[in-house]
């Protein structure tokens, strides 16, 4: 009986230690150590459409990456798509939980539906969201926030910290949230942040990123008190990060983590590219970045349809699931 109790105590201790490594502080402090020869390998698991949040499903990009390389990324991100709504909240939540349980650093994107009633790229009038009193646009967006807050609470109750991006590319005027410019884009980000924080959702590492447009990071920056991770998209052959020096200053002066929030290493019309170009660019131009997250949607963005993917993921400078 005593031996059984000892074994149980050890198992509980090990379980607790595992959870302690998944707290917000533990994960964020770890991310701060990256860069300069050690870079996080991330991958979008799902974007929108019908990419299944279960990492073992054939449509999930974590499965596709592993099938191609035999290696799992360290960071994986699932999108809660409220525009098309192809899955239930329970399916998205369970997808994030499976990532967490398998040892991934879990990310969550939101793709909020247009609160004015149109599609994701339809015109909007957003000021009513911030007005006193009730109105239909405000009610719609608050309903969506309540829905997502309930999901975040479920994740918190299950001991899961996530890197959360409330608005994908905050400056992207193809999307409804940016159609009225930086003023309301910033207000939306701050609103979600404050609303979730007041609900006690302290399992969130707050991520902000923009398109690769020059100057977008400064123009749309919500503020130091609202952002933990600053990111930039980079698509095509350039592998650019225009505001790198500004971002490095934020890293040094305000303790921010900086990375490529979205990365696609070539266009569809281009010939397959050597994946090691990413590592070369990091080492020679952007060594302060903590890493990157490859885009999904199609293999030409990531290691699946480019050259030396398995070798690239096995490189000791890249942090994958088994190399921490």
Segments and roles (model prediction):
Residues 109, 220-270, 312-315:
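Glycoside hydrolase catalytic-domain groove-lining segments
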Residues 84-202:
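Substrate-binding cleft of extracellular glycoside hydrolase catalytic domains
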Residues 22-78, 85, 90, 280, ...:
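N-terminal module-boundary/linker segments of secreted carbohydrate-active enzymes
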Residues 1-22:
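Bacterial Sec-dependent N-terminal signal peptides
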Residues 25-27, 54-65, 90-94, 148-151, ...:
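Alpha-helical scaffolding within the catalytic cores
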């Amino acid at each position: 009986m005593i031996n059984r109790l000892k074994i149980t105590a050890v198992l509980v201790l090990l379980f607790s230690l595992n959870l302690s490594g998944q707290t917000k502080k533990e994960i964020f402090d770890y991310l701060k150590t990256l860069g300069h020869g050690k870079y996080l390998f991330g991958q979008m698991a799902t974007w929108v459409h019908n990419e299944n949040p279960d990492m073992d499903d054939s449509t999930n990009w974590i499965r596709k990456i592993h099938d191609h390389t035999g290696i799992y990324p360290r960071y994986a991100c699932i999108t809660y798509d409220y525009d098309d709504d192809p899955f239930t909240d329970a399916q998205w939540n369970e997808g994030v939980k499976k990532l967490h349980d398998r040892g991934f650093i879990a990310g969550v994107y939101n793709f909020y539906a247009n609160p004015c009633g149109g599609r994701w790229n339809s015109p909007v009038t957003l000021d009513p969201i911030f007005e006193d009193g009730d109105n239909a646009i405000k009610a719609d967006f608050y309903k969506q926030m309540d829905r997502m807050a309930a999901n975040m609470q479920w994740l918190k109750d299950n001991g899961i910290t996530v890197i959360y991006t409330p608005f994908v590319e905050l400056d992207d005027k193809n999307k409804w949230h940016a159609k009225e410019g930086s003023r309301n884009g910033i207000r939306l980000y701050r609103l979600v942040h404050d609303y979730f924080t007041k609900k006690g959702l302290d399992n969130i590492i707050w991520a902000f990123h923009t398109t690769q447009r020059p100057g977008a990071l400064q123009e749309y920056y919500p503020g130091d008190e609202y952002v933990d991770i600053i990111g930039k998209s980079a698509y095509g052959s350039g592998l650019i990060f225009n505001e790198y020096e500004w971002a490095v200053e934020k890293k040094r002066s305000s303790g921010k983590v900086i990375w490529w929030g979205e990365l696609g290493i070539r266009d569809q019309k281009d010939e397959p590219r050597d994946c090691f170009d990413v590592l070369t660019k990091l080492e020679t131009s952007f060594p302060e970045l903590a890493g990157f997250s490859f885009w999904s949607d199609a293999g030409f963005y990531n290691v699946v349809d480019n050259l030396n993917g398995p070798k690239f993921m096995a490189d000791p400078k890249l942090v994958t699931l088994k190399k921490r």
